[in-house]
Amino acid sequence: MEKRVFRRKIYNAIGEWKRKSNGQTALLIEGARRIGKSTIVEKFAQEEYRSYILIDFNKASQEVKSLFNDLMDLDFIFLRLQQIYSKILYDRQSVIIFDEVQTCPKARQAIKYLVQDGRYDYIETGSLISIKKNTEGITIPSEEDRIQMYPMDYEEFRWALGDTATFPLLQIFWDKKMPLGAAHREAQKNLRLYMLVGGMPQAVNAYIDTNNLKAVDEAKRRIIRLYEEDFIKIDPTERVSKLFMSIPSILARNVSRYVPSSVIGEVEENKEMELLKSLEDSKTVNMSHHADDPNVGLPTTANYDKFKLYVCDTGLFITLAFWDKDFTENVIYDKLLTDKLPVNLGYVYENLIAQMLVASGNKLFYHTWPKDEKHYYEVDFLLSRGAKLCPVEVKSSGYKAHASLDAFSAKYSSRIKDRYLIYTKDFAREEETLYVPAYMTPLL
């Protein structure tokens, strides 16, 4: 299988850090495993520096790790690294990469003194950066700038397939609030392919190499098994793993919140919070919090005890939804490819939209309130735009019913800028509602 280095948007963000920091801070890139952190950082090092050393702390020898236990002689540390990795480092022209830095906390603590030394730049990558096991006994360096990295978004996926035209064109149509017309069907078909393959580079690579969704599914299963192994290292009782693996089944129930006890049973509140924090810190999930009083300052009204969980990648989500079934039994592949996804599988779109919104820089919030004694209204997502809110309702079909949007707009009319219904048909505007095809979600 050919190893490809895909074009990623974060490359420009790393370049911006290098220019602004000028050696005054290290850069920490956080994100789930297997999203391409190491690959893009190494590509940046190759193209933007005279030389680099990449230390993968998952593979590094004990000698390399022990170098960071005593920082009294930095000259010796740099000399040994150059010998071990057969690289020459040049003052202000080289970068040292700490890959999977969470597995060597002492190296992360050393960043403070390495940055102060000033000879080289430092880029760290990792996940599970903040959990107790990976921070116990060390001082977190303040000389760190952080960037969050995600699986390949829809535009990056199109780039990987050689399509650089779609998004500039979509932007034009969005700016003019125009439907695509005859081009809509093709645009929607392309989105459905992204939903199935997802944005994990290994899965995208498998698709490009084989044009075979079974091979793609196998690549995604390997990633999920890796996540399971990580979760078991954190919590040998497998509760973190269960919280992750159950996300599709919880979303399928269309309930207003994720209740951990329904998955792992009753545990002490502090322990439940610790398990959820570990899951969130793995960056494998996107968490949406309930906004009790939806207003422009959404975080200030967030209820952190009431939340929903989404899988960080649409492709992984689809594999996870049919985890116990053979690939041939995963009906989502066939139904999505043929555009016949039944309503009871609509949660696939909800997870997709959550991922798209997060990749576009949005924090996730939602809002529910009683309709009557047995039913409730729900706005799937709330976006903060200027001094106003944009409520978002997601449909997995072309239906234009939007009772929750209407009720929300009536209740909070003075707080609303635009109201969106994301669905599978072409762009349209009817009265106050903008009907947005799912592939335009990144432009909201």
What do these predicted ranges mean?
Residues 2-3, 18-19, 25, 34, ...:
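A cross-kingdom feature that marks ATP-driven nucleic-acid transaction machinery
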Residues 37:
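Conserved lysine of the Walker
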